[in-house]
Amino acid sequence: MNHSDALYKRIYQKLLTEIEEGMYKDGQRLPTEKELSQKYYVSRITAQKAMRALADEGKIVRVIGKGSYIAD
């Protein structure tokens, strides 16, 4: 596992925990990839990988040009 893989997994786990603890409500918009990259001091690609993993699991819905939202 390289450094960027570890970083994306850390962001993924942090967001997953926040989702499961109810920090975000169903349908609520999540921070953008740019906002996440600035918050966690990572590249936008790393933030994108974390968001893609959440989408692949059905935790969030990504809408091109609109953002990412908590799945209902």
What are the functions of these language-model segments?
Residues K66-D72:
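Basic, amphipathic "hinge/linker" alpha-helix immediately C-terminal to the N-terminal HTH DNA-binding motif
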Residues M1-R44, R52-V61, K66:
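Extreme N-terminal segment that seeds HTH/winged-HTH DNA-binding domains in transcriptional regulators
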